[in-house]
């Protein structure tokens, strides 16, 4: 299968794969918000304690800041009617509703293109019913590897410039 960036002809918007974009640490800064809510670095806090503190922080999810470069990335992909594909937390009953509120406040992604799933289910969005591949932009390499293994095109998000270059190489302008 030829990749879009290998084609010499001009690629139309309709020929491009659908974009599925993660939220946490791609668009919004979960770690910054979590560190503040927990009162210490999230990764060092006791697992049960940290999630209890997040659950008890009113407006935690919808109050997250943009991740550095997140607005720039969203502005670029917004032209292509992206989907949001984000894992909800099974440890915080507020995460689904809060993520939806964050998206409504900060983006124009319609509810029908927002998929809040268990982390391990992201790979189910790798290909469409017709077999065409989708793109996943995600900071977690395990998600990228699983998505690629199912026939998708994973972009491991480590910084916005790199992600935008990879999208442009795939034909997005």
Kindly give the residue locations of the regions a language model identified.
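Acidic, Mg2+-coordinating phosphoryl-transfer loop and its flanking beta/alpha structural elements
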Residues: 134-169
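Conserved Lys-Pro-Asp/Glu-containing loop-to-beta segment of HAD-superfamily phosphomonoesterases
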Residues: 114-147
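Short amphipathic alpha-helix with an adjacent loop that forms part of the alpha/beta core around
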Residues: 124-130, 166-173
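Short linear clamp-binding motif
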Residues: 1-9
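Short, acidic loop-to-helix structural element flanking the phosphoryl-transfer center
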Residues: 46, 55-84, 92-97
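Short, structured coil segments at secondary-structure junctions
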Residues: 78, 110, 149-151
């Amino acid at each position: 299968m030829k990749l879009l960036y290998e084609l010499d002809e001009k690629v139309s918007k309709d020929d491009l794969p659908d974009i599925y974009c993660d939220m946490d640490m791609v668009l919004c800064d979960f770690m910054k918000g979590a560190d503040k809510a927990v009162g210490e670095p999230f990764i060092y806090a006791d697992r049960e304690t940290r999630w209890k503190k997040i659950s008890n922080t009113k407006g935690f999810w919808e109050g997250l800041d943009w991740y550095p470069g997140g607005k720039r990335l969203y502005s670029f992909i917004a032209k292509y009617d992206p989907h949001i594909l984000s894992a909800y937390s099974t440890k915080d009953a507020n995460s689904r509703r809060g993520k939806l509120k964050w998206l409504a406040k900060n983006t124009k992604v319609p509810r029908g293109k927002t998929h809040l799933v268990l982390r391990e289910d992201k790979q189910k969005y790798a290909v469409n019913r017709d077999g065409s591949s989708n793109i996943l932009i995600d900071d977690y390499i395990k998600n990228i590897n699983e998505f690629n293994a199912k026939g998708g095109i994973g972009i491991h998000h480590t910084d916005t410039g790199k992600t935008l270059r990879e999208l442009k190489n795939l034909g997005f302008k």
